[in-house]
Amino acid sequence: MARTTPIARYRNIGISAHIDAGKTTTTERILFYTGVNHKIGEVHDGAATMDWMEQEQERGITITSAATTAFWSGMAKQYEPHRINIIDTPGHVDFTIEVERSMRVLDGAVMVYCAVGGVQPQSETVWRQANKYKVPRIAFVNKMDRMGANFLKVVGQIKTRLGANPVPLQLAIGAEEGFTGVVDLVKMKAINWNDADQGVTFEYEDIPADMQDLANEWHQNLIESAAEASEELMEKYLGGEELTEEEIKQALRQRVLNNEIILVTCGSAFKNKGVQAMLDAVIDYLPSPVDVPAINGILDDGKDTPAERHASDDEPFSALAFKIATDPFVGNLTFFRVYSGVVNSGDTVLNSVKTARERFGRIVQMHANKREEIKEVRAGDIAAAIGLKDVTTGDTLCDPENPIILERMEFPEPVISIAVEPKTKADQEKMGLALGRLAKEDPSFRVWTDEESNQTIIAGMGELHLDIIVDRMKREFNVEANVGKPQVAYREAIRAKVTDIEGKHAKQSGGRGQYGHVVIDMYPLEPGSNPKGYEFINDIKGGVIPGEYIPAVDKGIQEQLKSGPLAGYPVVDLGVRLHFGSYHDVDSSELAFKLAASIAFKEGFKKAKPVLLEPIMKVEVETPEENTGDVIGDLSRRRGMLKGQESEVTGVKIHAEVPLSEMFGYATQLRSLTKGRASYTMEFLKYDDAPNNVAQAVIEARGK
C-alpha cells in the first residue's frame, strides 16, 4: 500500500493541562470539528469520548492517555488534509508517569490553561517534562466565558511562572458572558464563529473599534517576535518594510520549532469558540515528524554504538511501545509510535530490549476507545497492536535484520505503598493476575510480596494512584480487596566516610573450608549523582584478591543494599572502594567473598553516621483567604516548611515542602478546615534526612 498522507502533513501532538482546565472538552471539540465525532460528548454529564475508563467518567478526571487519529483541512478549508494523532494526557499529579510517557512520543504539544485559574502547579510539572523532551508547544487559554476570565493575565503567568516567552497569536473579544470571538493578530481581523452550527462556520470581520489600539500594540509585538527569527527579516522590519503574512507565519513556526517562543491562542471549548483556530495553529506552527531531530538509539553490537533513525519509510522499521492497556474484548493493546520504516500486520519484529521476537497480529488505529483495523503502519504513525506477548512500556520494536534500542524512558520510583489482600481466599490467584496486568500497563506502579509478613504490597506515586488501582481490580477483574494503612518508602544512607573496614569469613572445619577477606572504604555519594545510587571501585593491587572474586564482593554488597542495617529499607547514594584483602588457594570461593563483603558492609555502615531518609513532597494548597492561617498552622504541625504564598483571584496559594508520612488523610482534614473550598496538589520532590525522633520511631516499629 502506498502512503496516503505525506509525512510532512502529520502532526503527532499531546494535549496537556491541569485538572479542570477543560482539556477533555477541548479534545472532544477537536474530534467534533475534525469530523470524527458527530455528537459532542460533555464531560459534565460523564459522556466524553476520550475518557474511556468508567472511573474517569465518574471522577471527571482523565487517567489513561488514549491515542486518537483525526484529519483537519483548516477552518476555511485552506490546507490539504493533515493527519493529527492526538495523545490525551492526564492532568492529575498522581499520573505524571502517563504524561512523561506521552511526551516521549510526541512531536508537539498544546498546553491548555484555564482563563480564570491560569498556570497551576501541575502545569509546571508538565512544563518541566516537555522541556526535558524539548517538545515545541503552543498554548490554548480555555474557559474565556467564565467569571473572572482574563486572557492577558494568563499570558503573563506563562512568562513569570513557567519562565517561557509567550507571544499571543490572538486577543479575546470580550470576556465572561460577553466573550464573542477572537482577534487574529496575523491577519488583523476579528473571527466570529457561527453559533447556529456549533462553530463549524465563521466570518472574518473588522476588529471592534474599541480594540483597535490594543490589537495594534499586540500585532507589533507579534511582528517583532517574527522578525527575530532571522537577520534578513530583522533588517526588513527595521527598514520599515511590511512583512507578508507568509513570512510572519514561517518565522513564527521556526521559532516555535526551536523552542524559543510559545504562541498563545484563546477561546471557550464549551461555547464552541477558538478550538477551530487552535487546530489551524497546530498545522501552521507545530512540527511534523520530519521537523524534529532523528530519534537516537544504540546498536545491539556489544559496543553500544550510537545510531539514529530518521522519519522515513525507506529506513529500517523502528518503533517505541509507549503504553500497554488491557482491553476487555481483545486482551493486551500495545500502543506504539513508529519512528522509521513500515510494518504490516502478520510481520515478525524484534523486541530489542528483551531480544525476543514478536509477531504483529492485528494492528488497529484508535479513536478514543473505538478502533479500526489497518493493514500497515508507516513512519510517523501511532497505532495499537493486539496480541504482542511480552512487551513492556519503553521497549523498542524493530526490524530483526537491523536491531536498534531506542532511548529508554526513565520512570520514577514509587513513594507510597500499601498492603492489599483479597476479601475472599478464592480470589488470591485472581488478584495476583490482576495486579500483574496492571503493573505491566504502568511502570510507576510496583507489586511484590513482603517476605516477612507474606503480604502483597502495592506501591505507586500517591494515594489517588493506589485508590484507582484497587478500584480497577474490582471493576475490570472482579476482585475486591482489603487495603492496609499506607506505608512510606523510606531509604537509608550514610553521611560520613569510613576507611579500612575489614570483613572476614573463615571456616575451617575438616575437609574444604571457606575463606574470604576484604578491606573496604565506604563514602556517601552526592544525591542523584549516580543513577544507580551506588558505585563500586576495585582498587586491588598485586592480585591480593584474584580477579574472579571481585564481582562476588560487589554482589555481596549490592545484596545488602536491598535491606539496610538501620530499618531494612533500601540503601542509596553509597560508594564502596575495595582496596585490600587476602585469599586462600584452596578454601576461597565466590560465596566466601560475598559473605566477607556483607560483613564489612554492615560493620562500616554502623560507623559511617547512618541516617534514615524520608520522602519530602512539594505541596501547593489553594485556599480562600480567611482560611490561610488555619491551613498554614496545619501544615506546620505536619512538619511542613513554608516556601511562600501568593494572592490569587480565588484566594491564596501556599507553597510548602512536607514529609509524605505526615500527609496521609490530608484531603479529609483540608476539607473540614475550609468547608471543602480549598484544593491541593502534591508531588514527590526529594529524599531528606528524617529527624531523630521520627527515625527512632520508624526503626522501632520495624523491630530493628
From Swiss-Prot:
tr-type G domain span: 8-290
Top-level taxonomy: Bacteria, Pseudomonadati, Pseudomonadota, Gammaproteobacteria, Enterobacterales
Annotated positions binding GTP: 17-24, 88-92, 142-145
InterPro entries, sorted: EFG_II, EFG_III, EFG_III/V, EFG_IV, EFG_V, EFG_V-like, EFTu-like_2, G_TR_CS
GO cellular component: cytosol
Family under the similarity heading: Belongs to the TRAFAC class translation factor GTPase superfamily. Classic translation factor GTPase family. EF-G/EF-2 subfamily.
Pfam families: EFG_C (PF00679), EFG_III (PF14492), EFG_IV (PF03764), GTP_EFTU (PF00009), GTP_EFTU_D2 (PF03144)
Cellular localization per UniProt: Cytoplasm
Example GO BP: ribosome disassembly
NCBIfam families named among the record's database cross-references: EF-G, PRK12740.1-5, small_GTP
Function: Catalyzes the GTP-dependent ribosomal translocation step during translation elongation. During this step, the ribosome changes from the pre-translocational (PRE) to the post-translocational (POST) state as the newly formed A-site-bound peptidyl-tRNA and P-site-bound deacylated tRNA move to the P and E sites, respectively. Catalyzes the coordinated movement of the two tRNA molecules, the mRNA and conformational changes in the ribosome.
Name the record gives this protein: Elongation factor G
PROSITE patterns, sorted: G_TR_1, G_TR_2
GO molecular function, one term: translation elongation factor activity
The UniProt record lists the keyword Coiled coil: no
Keywords: Cytoplasm, Elongation factor, GTP-binding, Nucleotide-binding, Protein biosynthesis
Major localisation: cytoplasm
